Amino acid sequence: MTDTELYDAIVVVTPNDFKRVESNNKRIVDYLPVRKVLFVGSKELGELVAQSSLGDKAGFVDENDIIPFDDVYNCIRDIMSDILLGRELPRGIAGWYYQQFLKLQYARVCQDKYYMSWDGDTVPCKDFSMFGDDGRPYFDLKHEFHEEYFTTMNKLLPNLNKTIDKSFISEHMIFDCHYVIKMLEDIEKNAAVKGKMFWEKILYSIRLEHIQENSFSEFETFGTYMAVNYPDIYNYRNWHSFRYGGYYFHPEVITQRDYDWLSKDFYAISFEKSHSVREDHENLFNNPVYQSKLTARQMVEI
């Protein structure tokens, strides 16, 4: 299905992660309620997308056309110089922050009112809409709390503190470009924090002893910014997704029957690269006999 409001989705993903869930990329393209799904990454990723059978609804955007990776890498390396002591900065540390900055900076190149960000390791189980009956977009909420996210955002924008009980982190978000740009401009106006671009100020706002712990969340920050400053722009919805799907299913062999079963409880399932199916879960959750008697949520809770 496609929402009445036309917009695209961006999926920021590495070539390795694109290949890791390759058999499910078509499902991401087919099930997201968007006009096009734009995979954002390196030129190698662009080649993989071009060689795929994802069809005309899939596209590619070079990450360096949004923000050059080297700019972010060099900034983090300079900030961490007293920790690194001449050693090379692991690309993974820079990559975690970089992919979040891409999702925010995309608002400045997007030609539509909205765009969605969708995590590349997460696969929709069923159709869904990102807009309520009143035409407002949804913030989808889950349960998560990481104090350092709020420490960082409060340095960036001192009026931001935890505002709602739940979390805005739900493996995806629909962004209103106008308000994302407004937030980025507000961050860039904060003369108390070093840096010129918003992403520089974010990096300089993170406590050095926590910079290797992924201490910023683009979803938590934008959701909190909107809840505090523009509380009537978005609807709130509880989002049910299977975050630890990789412990129960192999992404390369999960079937339509499995997705139909999962969809009774969940909008989406995630296959994180650190997850693998435990031996005692093999042939258990994909067993049609068990699926006919129990829901996925009941199986997990047993």
Language-model features: where?
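N-proximal low-complexity "stem/linker" segments adjacent to membrane-targeting elements
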Residues: 1-26
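Short, charged/polar "capping" segments at the starts of alpha-helices
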Residues: 19, 43-50
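Short, acidic, metal-binding catalytic loop of nucleotide-sugar glycosyltransferases
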Residues: 26-35
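Active-site-proximal specificity loops/subdomain of glycosyltransferases
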Residues: 48-108
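Short aromatic/hydrophobic "clamp" motif used to bind/position activated sugar donors
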Residues: 115
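Conserved donor-nucleotide/metal-binding helix-loop-beta segment in metal-dependent transferases, i.e.
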Residues: 122-157
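Catalytic core and acceptor-binding pocket of nucleotide-sugar-dependent glycosyltransferases
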Residues: 168-259
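Long, low-complexity C-terminal extensions of enzymes
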Residues: 242-302
